[in-house]
Amino acid sequence: MTYDEGDGLAVLDDPVGESLRGRHAGLGRRHGRTATYLPEVATFSALPADVEAADWADLARLLGRDAFADMFSCAAVPPPDWEPVFVLEGRQMLWSGGGTSGADDAGVVELGAADVPEMLDLIARTQPGPFWPRTRELGTYLGIRDGGRLVAMAGERLRPPGWTEISAVCTDPEVRGRGHAARLVGALADRVLARGERPFLHVAEKNAAAIALYERLGFTTRKHVTFRGFRTP
């Protein structure tokens, strides 16, 4: 499976905004031309492509004072009173395999509201990326247990039209090397493909091991992206 820019890829240039205008509208807030998720769901915010000073002001009003805004590939420079917090280079990768991952999903279970404390604990210990008490409401989350303890998980995050992002892929350091991440990503990819959508993901450029895993599973790099975080005045 290969794609060109005529295959609905344009929505992936603004996956946060496209998600908040569509599938995740009920999990976000809007003001003017800006949008953001509810703070207990995610810290991602979206600005229009032709951003103006008024848009930054609208986003600041939406978020409130001293709030965090996590931006996907935002090339625009914020006003000087916005505090830079981080810059992270990464990749956007698309599923380029067939209609199924062929992964073994033995031991994979669906996670629900009752599992959130364990999910937050695993996230805190492995640091795969931002995850909040209501992040699981963005989509399906799957996990693997060992002796009843949650040791690996992954889930669905951004949902631009026709696509589903796989995210929060993490494994307890004590059980790494057993193929848990591959099974979880494969199981999620199969679910996404089965409903007629296409899987994609984002990964930090410095995470060479994860990039290699995703390439083995059937993902290819579409483009390099820069993630930026700012704090409102």
Model-derived regions, located:
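Acyl-donor-binding surface of acyltransferase catalytic domains
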Residues: 2-103
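A short, internal acetyl-CoA/4′-phosphopantetheine-binding micro-motif in the GNAT/acyltransferase core
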Residues: 45-51, 169-176, 204
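Conserved acetyl-CoA-binding loop-helix of GNAT-fold acetyltransferases
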Residues: 53-59, 177-194, 211-216
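Conserved active-site alpha-helix within GNAT-family acetyltransferase domains
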Residues: 77-82, 182, 205-224, 231
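Extended, positively charged loop/linker patches that create polyanion-binding surfaces
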Residues: 106-107, 122-135
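A short beta-loop-alpha structural element at the N-terminal edge
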Residues: 107-118
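A conserved beta-strand-loop-helix scaffold within acyl/acetyltransferase catalytic domains
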Residues: 130-140, 144-172
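Conserved hydrophobic beta-strand within the GNAT/NAT acetyltransferase core sheet
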Residues: 166, 199-203
